[in-house]
């Protein structure tokens, strides 16, 4: 029996060897067919399972790493965005507070400026009033100072009048001619200022009625231009004391009066003056000239 069992095993071994040899021959034949025929369309043998499992694991790891990296990037961007948004709102709030503070400061400054302007206007009003008062006091003082010599001359004239038994007299520094007293200035004024000065002396600007009086005036006034009491401000020439102009003595220079308006001062020539050669000329009334005052000798004060 043992021999029979050994024979059976030998038989199986031979069959297996024969089958393996056949398989090898068949595989060799198939390999030869693949080599000889490039169009062989057979599927390649599949890889072992462990190798396939390892490839899938690597892909999963790569996908997981990519997802983690993407999540980190999203978190960083989100954090920066929140920080920027926070800084933006902080800056906006700061700007709003600055605008509010600046507006309040401007309003306060405007309010203080208005108060200061009011105070400044009030002070200007007070100063203007003070200036007017000072000018008024100055005019009064000037009036008294100018009249003090006049009062002194009046007393002197009255004393001379009584001492001369009623003889008429002229004040000190006045020159007598033909029953009138004349005073010649040593400085200059405009025509209106000179006329006012003579009135303060109880006199008037010089009025010339004759050739003799003209020569007397030219002799005493020197080589200066002097104002006389003749004007056409109203459109026609008139003497300040009311003396008739048309029928009275005249000594105009050639082509005068011409009312020339080409000078720089502007306006017309409405006031008469005696030139250095003794002839009369119409001139701009704001011109500064010397002048002469005249009054009757028989006036006593």
From Swiss-Prot:
It holds the Pfam family Lectin_C. It comes from the Eukaryota. Glycans are attached at residues 97, 119, 165. It is found in: Membrane. Mediates the endocytosis of plasma glycoproteins to which the terminal sialic acid residue on their complex carbohydrate moieties has been removed. The receptor recognizes terminal galactose and N-acetylgalactosamine units. After ligand binding to the receptor, the resulting complex is internalized and transported to a sorting organelle, where receptor and ligand are disassociated. The receptor then returns to the cell membrane surface. Interacts with LASS2. This is Asialoglycoprotein receptor 2. It comes from Rattus norvegicus. The gene is Asgr2.
């Amino acid at each position: 029996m043992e021999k029979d069992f050994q024979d059976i095993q030998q038989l199986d071994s031979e069959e297996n060897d024969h089958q393996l040899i056949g398989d090898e021959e068949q595989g060799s034949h198939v390999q030869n067919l693949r080599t000889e025929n490039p169009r062989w369309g057979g599927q390649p043998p599949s890889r072992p399972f462990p190798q396939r499992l390892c490839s899938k694991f690597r892909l999963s790891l790569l996908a997981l790493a990519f997802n983690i990296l993407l999540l980190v990037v999203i978190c960083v961007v989100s954090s920066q965005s929140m920080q920027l948004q926070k800084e933006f709102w902080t800056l906006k709030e700061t700007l709003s507070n600055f605008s509010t503070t600046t507006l309040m400061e401007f309003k306060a400054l405007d309010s203080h400026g208005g108060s200061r302007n009011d105070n400044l206007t009030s002070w200007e009003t007070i100063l203007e009033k003070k200036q007017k008062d000072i000018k008024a006091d100055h005019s009064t003082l000037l009036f008294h100072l100018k009249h003090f010599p006049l009062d002194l001359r009046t007393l002197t004239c009255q004393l001379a009048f009584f001492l001369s038994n009623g003889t008429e007299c002229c004040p000190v520094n006045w020159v007598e001619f033909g029953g009138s007293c004349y005073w010649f200035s040593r400085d200059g004024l405009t025509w209106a200022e000179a006329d006012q000065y003579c009135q303060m002396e109880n006199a008037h600007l010089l009025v010339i009625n004759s050739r003799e009086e003209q020569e007397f005036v030219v002799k005493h006034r020197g080589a200066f231009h002097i104002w006389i009491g003749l004007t056409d401000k109203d459109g026609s020439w008139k003497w300040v004391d009311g003396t008739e102009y048309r029928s009275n003595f005249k000594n105009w220079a050639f082509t005068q009066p011409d009312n020339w308006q080409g000078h720089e001062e502007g306006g017309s020539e409405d006031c008469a003056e005696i030139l250095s050669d003794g002839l009369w000329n119409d001139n701009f009334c704001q011109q500064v000239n010397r002048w002469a005052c005249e009054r009757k000798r028989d006036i006593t004060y």
